[in-house]
Each structure stands twice: as structure tokens, then as C-alpha cells.
Amino acid sequence: MNAIQSDLYAALPEIIILCMAMFVLLLDLFLKSHNRSLIYIFTQLGLAAAAVVTACTHNVSVVSYAFNGMFVDDPLSDVLKLMMYLTTSVMLVYTRQYVSLRDMFRGEYFALTLFALLGMMIMVSGQHFLTLYMGLELLSLCLYALVAMDRDNPRATEAAMKYFVLGALSSGMLLYGMSMLYGVTGTLDVAEVANALLQGAPDHAVLVLGVVFLIAGLGFKLGAVPFQMWVPDVYHGAPTAVTLFIGSVTKLAAFAFMIRLLIQGLYVLAIDWQGMLAIMAVLSILIGNITAIAQTNLKRMLAYSTISHVGYLLYGFMSAGTNGYVSAMFYIMAYVLMTLGGFGIMLLLSRKGFEADNLEDLKGLNQRSPWYAFLMLIIMFSMAGVPPTLGFYAKFAVLQAALQAGFVGLVIFAVVMAAIGGFYYLRVVKLMYFDEPLDNTPIKAPIDMKVLLSLNALLLLALGMFPQRLMDICAYAITHSFQ
């Protein structure tokens, strides 16, 4: 009985999110349309409750296992979960007005968001291939439905179909890679796979082939080249509220997935997967930055920007050392904050019947609202890596880790591409400050959205000038989880 209680205690945050998701679905059945704000309130309360439980049950420097070693509770999982709660909560604040104006303010929107969050939490704490895959599939199925949520938009339906087909293909590759590793090592437990590899597995060629399939599946989930074909279409076709969710919170789960699989499970094969990640990183930075320059749609531009950011993230992983993993975690945190701000401004400018998703929609924003133009300026500078913003320090950290690992040529390439990539971010600034507005409609938004958006952008500036605290949190999460 004590073992069961211990298992349930370890998974208490997941249980809270699961119960709240089911409660939201039931509540929606009994509420009239004008009372649906209660669904939003209960969703936020569920996130707050899960955050409090995660913080209160956190044990410093203690790694505990549950469900026969299939579930782990360590500093890395706790830090990432807290970041997920925060990001999801902010995302719901940013999107509340947007979804209410588009007949998407329904129980299933909030329930799917919570179920997707549950899948990500399982991925973060998964210590077994089946647990990791179960969390991934729960997340993926929810995202397919969310992309198609706006049923009157044919672009959204098309994007959901593409996402589903390509997602199923990537899941198959992941499963195939896992089955190959199981065939060689005889186990699906991440720690036991690592031990089997340390003792020396006989079929190295089969192992490498399995790693190739795993990297391909992971590359799709991250949106790295050459598995990025879904990113622009899904970002463009999905409702902006859903694009924000896909572009921010889910990347934290993908980061955790890579940590659990590659670092904790397959570190012995680092020399094999390092080269694969290096190729993906270089291609992602190159194609992401070059293609983004040609875009006129803001969502597609940010989609290709995401691809290039994934390339920089992979620099941290291919460094194959503690500094690299810490810098990669720091980078993903910075990326999530930048993405929240960028899409937050887009949602702020949107209104009923109008999607502010073209670059031209930002023309003359400084004349309409100097404050929001200033916030977007900070966000764009951070994405471009201009000091003293958080984006600059994040790029500096991953490139420094890669330099210490001996990838001098790749670091020089990344710096050159960062300078080239700055063009399309500065183009946004030029449109806001030097062009005449095409639309003088007053910008209306809830006060909580305005306050959070302001804090979001200013945080990018503050953390850029004083990044050490966030870096210390990332270092603590990484170093105290790998014992």
C-alpha cells in the first residue's frame, strides 16, 4: 500500500491536471455560453494548484522514482513543469480574447490544452521508452485537434491533416528506433539501456540505425531540418492561439524528450549522434534564416525563425557536456519567453474578422501605440540576438559551449548566419517605426493581457542584463538530475 501511495504522491501534479481537464469538460456541458468564463477560471486554478504541489513536493538534490522506475521526479522535471505551468497560464491570458471572438471559447479548447499539458508532463518525467511515447502521443493527438479547432477555416483543416500525417510518420520512426534499441539491449528502461550500452552491446550497426530513426523522430517534433516541412504550414494555418501553444510550451517537452533519450539513455553513443545533430543544426540555421527573409506573412516568418532557433538549440546538445546541456536549457527558456511575446503582440492586434498575421499589419505601430511598438522592438531584438537582450546571452551561451567542445568552424558559421538572420527581424522594426499605418483602429485588449505582455517583453530585457539567476536555475536542474 505504501508503494502505491508513494507512486500517486510522485504523480500528484499530473493527477491534478487530469482531474481538472475532465472537470472542465463536464462543467462545459452544464454552462450556458455567457457563463463560460468559469471554464477559464477553473483552468487557471488547476494550473496554479499543480504549480503549488510541484513546488511544495520538490526535494533539492533528490531524484526519486515511481511506477517501477518508469516515472522520475528530479530537479529537471520540476523546473520544466513549473515553466510549463507558467507558460500555459500566460498563453491562456493572451488567447482569451482571441478565442472568445472566434467561437473557440469552449470546454474542449481548455480540456485539450490541459490534456496536452499532461502529455508534456509525462514526457518530462518519463524514464521508460513506453512512458515517453505515451506522453508524446497524448500531446500529439491533442495538438492535431487544436489545430483543426477553427472548423470554419479551411486552412486550419488542411494544416491539421498535414500535421497528422507527418506526425504519424515521425511517431512510427520513433517506435522503430525504440524497437531496435530494445532488440539489442533487451530493455525499454532508459537507465537500463544506458547500463547495457556501457557494458558493450554486440550489434553496434543496429544500435546506430536505431539512433538514426530516433533522431529523425526527435527532429520532427522539434521542427529541425530536414524534418521541418510541417512547421510553416501548421504555424500559418492554425489559429494564432494554437500556434502560440505549439511554438512555445511544446518545445520544453521536446527538450526534455531529448535529454531523457540522448543524454540519460544513449550518452555512450554520443559520438554517433553528435554528427547527426551537427548536420541538422547547420541546415536548420541556414534554411531557417534564408527562407525567413522571403516571407511576407508574420506567422510563416516566425515559423522559419523557429527552425533557425532549433538549430542553435542543437548546438548545445552536440557539445555533449554539462555546459552544453545547461546552455541548451537556458536557450529553450529564452526561446519560449520570446515566442510568447511575439505571438502575444500578434494576438493583441487581432480582432474579430481580422488576423494581424501579415508583416504589413505592423506598419506604423509606433504611431498607433508607441508602448506596444517598443515591446515588439525588444522582442525582435531578442530574437535577433542583439545585446543586451536575453536572446543575445542565450546565443552566446550555446555558441560558447560549442566552442569549448571544439566546433570552431560551426560557431563561425552560426555567428555569420545570426548577422544575416537579423535582417528579417529588423525589417519588422522598420515597418513599425518608419512606415505609415494601414489601419488606425484603436488597440483594445484586457488589462491582464496588457500587463503580462509588458512584463513579458521587459523580462527579456532584464534577464539579458542579469542572466545569471536563470542560468543558475538551469545549471541546478541539469547537474542535480544526472547522478
From Swiss-Prot:
Keywords: Cell inner membrane, Cell membrane, Membrane, NAD, Quinone, Translocase, Transmembrane, Transmembrane helix, Transport, Ubiquinone
Alphabetical list of InterPro entries matching this protein: NADH-Q_OxRdtase_suN/2, ND/Mrp_TM
Reaction(s) this enzyme catalyzes, per UniProt: a quinone + NADH + 5 H(+)(in) = a quinol + NAD(+) + 4 H(+)(out)
EC assignment: 7.1.1.-
Keyword field contains RNA-binding: no
Membrane topology: Multi-pass membrane protein
Chief location category: membrane
Keyword Transferase tagged: no
Transmembrane parts of this sequence: 11-31, 37-57, 82-100, 110-130, 164-184, 205-225, 239-259, 268-288, 301-321, 329-349, 372-392, 406-426, 446-466
Disulfide bonds: none
Subcellular location(s) of the protein: Cell inner membrane
A GO MF term: NADH dehydrogenase (ubiquinone) activity
One Gene Ontology CC term in the entry: plasma membrane
Protein purpose: NDH-1 shuttles electrons from NADH, via FMN and iron-sulfur (Fe-S) centers, to quinones in the respiratory chain. The immediate electron acceptor for the enzyme in this species is believed to be ubiquinone. Couples the redox reaction to proton translocation (for every two electrons transferred, four hydrogen ions are translocated across the cytoplasmic membrane), and thus conserves the redox energy in a proton gradient.
Family to which the UniProt record says this protein belongs: Belongs to the complex I subunit 2 family.
PANTHER family (alphabetical): NADH DEHYDROGENASE
Protein name: NADH-quinone oxidoreductase subunit N
Species for this entry: Methylovorus glucosotrophus (strain SIP3-4)
UniProt lineage: Bacteria, Pseudomonadati, Pseudomonadota, Betaproteobacteria, Nitrosomonadales
